[in-house]
Amino acid sequence: MLPYSPMIEEAKRQIDRSLEHFMSQIKRDYKLHLVNPILYKSIREFSLRRGKRIRPLLLILSYKGYCPARKRISSSLYHASTCIELLHNFMLIHDDIIDQSHLRRGKPTLHKILGKIVRTKRREKLGYDLGIIAGDIVYALAIDAFLSIREAPQRKERALKYFIQTAAFTAMGEFVDTLHGVENISKIKEKDVFLNYTLKTARYTFDCPLVVGAILAGANEDDIRKLSELGVLIGQAFQIQDDIIGIFDSQKNIGKSILSDLAESKKTLLVCHAYRTLHSSQKRLFIKLFNKPQKTYQDLLAIRKIFLCAGSLHYSLRQIQKRLDATFTILQHLKIRNKYREIIKDVILRLFKHSEGIAHRHHLAI
């Protein structure tokens, strides 16, 4: 993939520097290292792991796109943008505990690291308990980071409220996702899947960064509403792609166990479509494989084949494209500066190279 423009690369470097600076600041302000050196060290290491930084980047691009052209951009914007990355980390920490995952971004999950603080037969339980607490700390730090923005008080208060509402919506999505995991597949409808995608992924990954940046910059109400709609569409498409990658990509590329989504029996669009489309013996085989408590790599290959035969991969890829088309239609009508419209479009397109590659490998036109 071609590198981002120099402006985007510099913005990402500034986000990383701001995140590192914030980690040093909380060491001074909260004295986490005095409570327990491993607590601070593990939160810092987890937060600074390499990532796309897509959420803070979108917040910054949205803000710059709507603020007056001659306005000097304060460094506090980059510092505050880390709030959305910390919110992301908080979600990941708790999500990994719920899913009992061992890997995150190619390294041990935070609860696995914390479970090794002391030698005990109850190491796994200890790791889960400490991970929940560490996640709560990271959420509080996210709000602290947000408060560092220097902007008009009314805008700041409204943006903070939106940020907190987003955290609540995302937790609701996690709640629904966890319930879906134990419900019979026959009870899950496509609309339930998309509601979960909206709550658990779209709200905090795209909707919140774009809307918060626009609110802080003083964007008009119509554009704020459209940005929220656009964010939900991209977020749904992004989660569909993530589900596809979890089945059709390699563990090396995704940085977590390739069997994790299958092990948790997640009710994805792929799963929902296959169940609805398959008949008789094929459906019975699919249900048998899907409901197995301990799935093997051979089971994964069999489920991949079923998704291909049922047309579920093709259907899911077309749903991604449908949402991207709608996204770019909305983007074209926003009253955002054209330079940032094009940059945001480029950032979005780059996020979907994985699904393009998978479609190409399986000779599927979308």
Where are these regions (language model features)?
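All-alpha prenyltransferase/terpene-synthase fold signal
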Residues: M1-I366
